[in-house]
UniProtKB/Swiss-Prot annotation:
Gene Ontology biological process: meiotic cell cycle; negative regulation of protein localization to nucleolus
Origin: domain of life: Eukaryota
Entry keyword set: Cell cycle
Its biological purpose: Component of the FEAR (CDC14 early anaphase release) network which promotes CDC14 release from the nucleolus during early anaphase and is required for the efficient segregation of telomeric and nucleolar regions. Although BNS1 can partially compensate for a lack of SPO12 function when overexpressed, it does not appear to play any role in controlling meiotic nuclear division.
InterPro entries the UniProt entry points to: Spo12 (IPR007727)
Protein name: Protein BNS1
Pfam families registered for this protein in UniProt: Spo12
Length: 137
């Protein structure tokens, strides 16, 4: 190898070796840093998961009981309402015959059901009918 100039072959080889050694040591440092960074990332992830888990546990302890109590109260209220509806009897129920009761139940079902009324199109019907002049004979 001839490099020209005043530098001797020895100096050039020393520089090449020095560059190779520093590049090797840099890659080793990078590998060490990568493993350290990976370890650091994993430990941070575990710490975050633990913190999140503790946060959710605390939230669950605080709010789960109130939710259960509220749910139980709502269920109890619904049960009482259904029992009251089933037990309620109007004063006229004793006066009605079984047939009249059935008719009243049927009427209440008909009127409580939502229905869609039919549209009446009288205007169109009149326009479609051809008009003939009145001829008196």
């Amino acid at each position: 190898m001839s490099y020209g100039g005043s530098a001797s072959q020895d100096i050039v080889t020393k520089l090449i070796r020095k560059i190779q050694n520093t590049s090797v040591s840099c890659t080793r440092r990078d590998e060490n840093l990568d493993s350290f960074n990976q370890h650091l990332k994993m430990s941070l992830k575990v710490a975050h998961n633990t913190k999140t888990f503790a946060k959710h546990c605390l939230h669950r302890q605080v709010f789960k009981n109130t939710y259960r109590k509220r749910k139980a109260v709502e269920d109890q209220r619904k049960n009482l309402n259904t029992q009251l509806r089933q037990k309620f009897a109007s004063p006229s129920d004793n006066l009605l015959s079984p047939c009249s009761r059935k008719l009243n139940d049927h009427k209440s079902k008909l009127f409580s059901a939502k229905s869609q009324p039919k549209t009446l199109e009288f205007v169109r019907g009149k326009q479609n009918i051809p008009r003939k002049p009145n001829v008196d004979i």
